[in-house]
């Protein structure tokens, strides 16, 4: 476990508990995703790392870039101020990732990685999501990527479960059985 994860965990847990109490899990997910994306831009990273930029300037930048939602949210503004004062802004991507883990556990959602040979239609995505939800007894969130080297089919990873329905996987299994 990295030091950044250890440092980010209490922030993520506190944000999650606040969002849960306020029943605003998805809103906070959006906020954290946006903040994480902003601090990862080269310009923001350079500005935050610059010793000449003050905490107030960094806070103002984040609130300005993130828009009007942020100006009305005291808890979010306090979070930005706290992270800035403690020099933890660059932990926002880690905080966001940990928050999403807590949220998924709370909502009983499992993130499923699907690597497909070609683009899946919305109907195929819906059928796959329903089938996996039924098999895993949880809601699933599909994270789909394309890999033409699969030659056809798809590779599905859900936690410890791996389903290799790709042509490449079947050819590898056939080659292994013929070699034995």
Curated annotation (Swiss-Prot):
Q: Which InterPro entries match?
A: ATP_synth_OSCP/delta_N_sf, ATPase_OSCP/d_CS, ATPase_OSCP/dsu
Molecular-function GO term, any one? proton-transporting ATP synthase activity, rotational mechanism
Q: What membrane topology does the annotation report for this chain?
A: Peripheral membrane protein
Task: Name its cellular compartments.
Answer: Cell inner membrane
Main location (coarse class): membrane
- Swiss-Prot/TrEMBL keywords: ATP synthesis, Cell inner membrane, Cell membrane, CF(1), Hydrogen ion transport, Ion transport, Membrane, Transport
Superkingdom: Bacteria
Can you cite an annotated GO cellular component? plasma membrane
Q: Which PROSITE patterns does the annotation name?
A: ATPASE_DELTA (PS00389)
Q: How does it assemble?
A: F-type ATPases have 2 components, F(1) - the catalytic core - and F(0) - the membrane proton channel. F(1) has five subunits: alpha(3), beta(3), gamma(1), delta(1), epsilon(1). F(0) has three main subunits: a(1), b(2) and c(10-14). The alpha and beta chains form an alternating ring which encloses part of the gamma chain. F(1) is attached to F(0) by a central stalk formed by the gamma and epsilon chains, while a peripheral stalk is formed by the delta and b chains.
Q: What does this protein do?
A: F(1)F(0) ATP synthase produces ATP from ADP in the presence of a proton or sodium gradient. F-type ATPases consist of two structural domains, F(1) containing the extramembraneous catalytic core and F(0) containing the membrane proton channel, linked together by a central stalk and a peripheral stalk. During catalysis, ATP synthesis in the catalytic domain of F(1) is coupled via a rotary mechanism of the central stalk subunits to proton translocation.
Member of which family? Answer: Belongs to the ATPase delta chain family.
The name this protein goes by in its record: ATP synthase subunit delta
Starting at the broadest rank, the lineage of the source organism is: Bacteria, Pseudomonadati, Pseudomonadota, Gammaproteobacteria, Legionellales
